[in-house]
């Protein structure tokens, strides 16, 4: 069961994907460009810090050229976009180390700013129960994921529901259902998301931590271990003991290819 299916059906009418779709298992179509209708795009809010786009790309103009991006860095497999924020950048996975993009930018150059990345335990096909995306806030709060903290504001949280993730040949739409601060421990190492029991435990713990400082969307309890979730995580340098996370559930898989085998 998916939450807000009427919204998902409406979004499907707005989303346009060019080319042959990709299949799960890290194999992708040869289509050069993935497009999304401009109606799903938004302008960066006044409170966000404007940063130079990576390689001139932006999902706000309704297209991502993955061929061009992979010529720059073959580790790029996706592009994340959250309307009304400065989060509009590539997502990478390094074959060298899970922490490579902690101190390297999306060009592969040494840079304390880092890049948005996933660990090797997650599939680049986005077929895991929970794909964890890491990004820095930065000392001056101008990092790639600094705007995640805006979701701590209940009004901003209520008004901004969606995360868009571009793959080569697909556009995935996620609805944000939780934003909160948690202990700074690795989700990938805390929960075994390859088993339903690990997925259930993650959701149970999320439910158990809800409180005044936690923003939750209505009907979030409908999210279960059979859904596909992304967790966006960041932290402030002066508060190394905790991390801020924004959790969203897949509500629209335009190409219809997201699937997985689940194990009890």
Go through each PLM region and give its residues.
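Bacterial N-terminal signal peptides that target proteins for export
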Residues: 2-11
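Sec-dependent N-terminal signal peptides
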Residues: 11-17
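C-terminal motif of bacterial Sec signal peptides marking the signal peptidase cleavage site
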Residues: 20-23
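Solvent-exposed, non-transmembrane regions of membrane-associated and secreted proteins
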Residues: 25-264
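Accessible peptide chain termini
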Residues: 1-2, 80
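Residue-level signal for mature regions of secreted extracellular proteins and peptides
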Residues: 17-18, 228
């Amino acid at each position: 069961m998916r939450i807000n299916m009427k919204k998902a059906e409406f979004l499907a009418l707005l989303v346009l994907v060019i080319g042959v779709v990709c299949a799960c298992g890290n194999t992708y179509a040869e289509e050069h460009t993935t497009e999304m209708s401009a109606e799903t795009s938004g302008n960066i809010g006044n409170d966000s810090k404007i940063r130079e786009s990576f390689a001139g790309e932006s999902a706000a103009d309704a297209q991502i050229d993955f061929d061009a991006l992979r010529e720059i860095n073959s580790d790029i497999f996706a592009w994340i976009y959250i309307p009304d924020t400065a989060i509009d950048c590539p997502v990478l996975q390094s074959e060298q180390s899970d922490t490579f993009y902690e101190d390297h930018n999306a060009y592969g150059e040494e840079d304390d700013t880092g890049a948005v990345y996933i660990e090797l335990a997650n599939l680049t096909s986005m077929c895991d129960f929970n794909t964890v995306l890491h990004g820095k806030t930065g000392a001056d709060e101008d990092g790639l994921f600094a705007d995640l903290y805006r979701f701590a504001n209940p009004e901003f949280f209520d008004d901004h529901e969606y995360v868009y993730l571009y793959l080569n040949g697909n556009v995935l739409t996620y609805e944000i259902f939780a934003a909160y601060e948690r202990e700074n421990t690795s989700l990938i190492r805390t929960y075994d998301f390859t088993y339903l029991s690990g997925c259930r435990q993650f959701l149970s713990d999320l439910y158990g931590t809800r409180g005044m400082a936690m923003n939750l969307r209505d009907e979030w309890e409908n999210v279960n271990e059979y859904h596909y979730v992304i967790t966006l995580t960041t932290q402030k340098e002066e508060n190394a003991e905790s991390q801020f996370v924004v959790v969203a559930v897949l509500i629209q898989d335009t190409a219809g290819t997201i699937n997985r085998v689940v194990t009890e």
